[in-house]
Amino acid sequence: MKALFIGGTGTISTDVVALAQQRGWEITLLNRGSKKMPEGIHSIIADINDEEAVAKAIALEHYDVVAQFIGYTAEDVKRDIRLFQNKTRQYIFISSASAYQKPLTDYRITESTPLVNPYWQYSRNKIEAEEVLMSAYRTSGFPVTIVRPSHTYNGTKPPVAVHGDKGNWQILKRILDGKPVIIPGDGSSLWTLTHSKDFAKGYVGLMANPHAIGNAFHITTDESMTWNQIYQTIADALGKPLNALHVASDFLAKHSDHYDFRGELLGDRKSTRLNSSH
């Protein structure tokens, strides 16, 4: 079976591509070619935003799955519908678990939890994209499956709550140097983390699955930890003591516009969230 991955080299998608290939999928990556292609992977070097160029590149192709990992807005998916209508048996869109209702009315999150996020434009854009896709499914049979990842990490992107311009590894460097690291709130809220290899198992299971068409799924592990536990685990792995500085999430959101902490904290990581699938 053939799959076209739009993107395919990011934190989440790299392990999905590897597992799909391992299970016998013929994989093509459509991206701008800035990273080396894994062995055995086909490549279409193009900018997905150049609709005419992409249409020419796939003119003679048909895919069992189109996997969209870099779609963010309603306009992005409208373009994809034009490109891939009648070109694929399944279109899988990566949304976000941050789209679920905020503030939370129940810490237990399922796929039927309403999609409302007044704090983060990123999440609202994902919600609008989902609405466009589900409308296309209902009106024209566009074969969409929606996947909502939660906080996903891997060996190159360790899980932290907030960081500055130097990224996630800045936090690990501060721990190694004995410097304080910020933990939002009192660090007691529960959080679900998922390794990208675990995410890949769930994702590949949805590929070419006819029961997944027209449905949304979040893919997470069933283990939850407090932010204090998460940071302590990182410090223990580094062999260093944790020098935690607890700062109220509302204060961080108010005074840290440069880093968009309002969106990431109030719109996602401030509250306890336990993802559970039906």
Identify the residue ranges that each predicted region occupies.
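Short-chain dehydrogenase/reductase
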Residues: 107-111, 115-131, 151, 161-169, ...
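Mid/C-terminal beta-alpha module of Rossmann-like enzyme folds, strongest
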Residues: 205-267
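Conserved beta-loop-beta element that borders a ligand/cofactor-binding pocket
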Residues: 131-160
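Substrate-positioning beta->alpha
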Residues: 163-171, 184-207, 214-215
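Rossmann-fold cofactor-recognition segment
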Residues: 37-50, 70-72
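N-terminal Rossmann NAD(P)H-binding glycine-rich loop of SDR-like oxidoreductase domains
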Residues: 3-23
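Conserved small/polar residues in nucleotide/adenosyl-binding loops
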Residues: 272-278
